Structure formats: C-alpha cells, structure tokens
C-alpha cells in the first residue's frame, strides 16, 4: 500500500460550517474510493507566501492516507480542481522506506 500526503488550502472567507462540511466531504471522497485516512490536521488560517485568486490568507488542511490504487487521489484532484472553495492543493506520495 502507498501512503500519500494531501495538503489543500480553503479560501479564507468561507463560513465555519461550510468549511467543516467541505473537509468532511473531501475526507469522505477519499474513504469511499478505498483509502484509509491515517491522519488529518487542521493548520488553521495562515498567510500565503503570495496571493492566490486575490486571497492573502487561507485555511490549511493536511490529510495522510494509505491506499492500494490512485482512484482516491485522482478523484480528489478532479473535484478539487472544480471546487471554488479550494484555492490550492498538492498530492505527494511518501517514500516507501518509512
């Protein structure tokens, strides 16, 4: 099984309830595609290194998953691209020797 780390930034002007629903939805997408969510961290609101879509801050979320295939990461990326609430994301495959 491969381990991935997914970091995504949610727009700063989102309501708290909407942010919680968004995080639950994307964690559910990962789990429904056969991934095991190992860890989830909410880093809170942080200043961006540079402006993204006229935003200078964003809510950072990090999720570590373990999966047999790429279906969950592919689906996450597909939906994150079309969701206006997520302003940036990155999916990183962790080394096997950990």
From Swiss-Prot:
Binds together with bS18 to 16S ribosomal RNA. Belongs to the bacterial ribosomal protein bS6 family. The keyword Nucleus does not apply. Pfam families: Ribosomal_S6. It comes from Staphylococcus epidermidis (strain ATCC 35984 / DSM 28319 / BCRC 17069 / CCUG 31568 / BM 3577 / RP62A). GO terms for cellular component: cytoplasm; ribonucleoprotein complex; ribosome. Keywords: Ribonucleoprotein, Ribosomal protein, RNA-binding, rRNA-binding. InterPro entries: Ribosomal_bS6, Ribosomal_bS6_CS, Ribosomal_bS6_sf, Ribosomal_S6_plastid/chlpt, Transl_elong_EF1B/ribsomal_bS6. This is Small ribosomal subunit protein bS6. NCBIfam families: S6. GO terms for biological process: translation. One of its GO terms (molecular function) is small ribosomal subunit rRNA binding.
